[in-house]
């Protein structure tokens, strides 16, 4: 599968989970489960971008700038959200800000990074190979209990800071 398609599909997964979390009753078991799933998918998304997609684009052209700053913005807003109890008066506002930042990040990526910006020269075959690696990595991480535990630990750390 083409790397661009993998990213777009994963953005759709993240946005869909964001919608489902937002529709679930605040502080419900359903919302907590969906939110945990979204955290795992978000971390997987950052992994495939930071470990596979961006390095491949950098190797095919010039280093990709600004991406880590965008990820940091999403993580910073996530940390704020995690520190806000769901029953707190400002929780819904924090949730909406996080979801807006996350969706804006996905939209900017699709606008600026798909297709790869000039002067990156990546062939269709390289895009297919990269996409296959990314899709395999997504499935590997989704199926890993250790990765799930690691992601929950990261969320707890963000919450505590």
Curated annotation (Swiss-Prot):
Superkingdom as given in the UniProt entry: Bacteria
Name of the protein in its database record: Uncharacterized protein Mb2666c
Organism of this sequence: Mycobacterium bovis (strain ATCC BAA-935 / AF2122/97)
Source taxonomy: Bacteria, Bacillati, Actinomycetota, Actinomycetes, Mycobacteriales
């Amino acid at each position: 599968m083409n790397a661009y398609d993998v990213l777009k599909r994963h953005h759709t997964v993240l946005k869909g989970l964001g919608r489902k979390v937002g529709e679930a009753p605040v502080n419900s078991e359903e919302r907590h489960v969906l939110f945990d799933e979204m955290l795992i998918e978000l971390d997987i998304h950052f992994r495939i971008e930071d470990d596979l997609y961006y390095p491949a684009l950098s190797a095919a052209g010039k280093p990709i700038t600004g991406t880590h700053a965008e990820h940091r913005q999403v993580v910073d807003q996530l940390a704020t959200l995690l520190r806000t109890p769901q029953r707190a008066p400002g929780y819904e506002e924090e949730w909406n800000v996080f979801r807006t930042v996350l969706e804006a990040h996905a939209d900017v990526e699709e606008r600026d990074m798909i297709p790869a910006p000039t002067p990156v020269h990546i062939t269709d075959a390289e895009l297919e190979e990269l996409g296959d690696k990314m899709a395999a990595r997504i499935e590997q991480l989704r199926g890993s209990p250790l990765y799930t535990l690691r992601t929950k630990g990261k969320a707890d750390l963000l919450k505590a800071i």
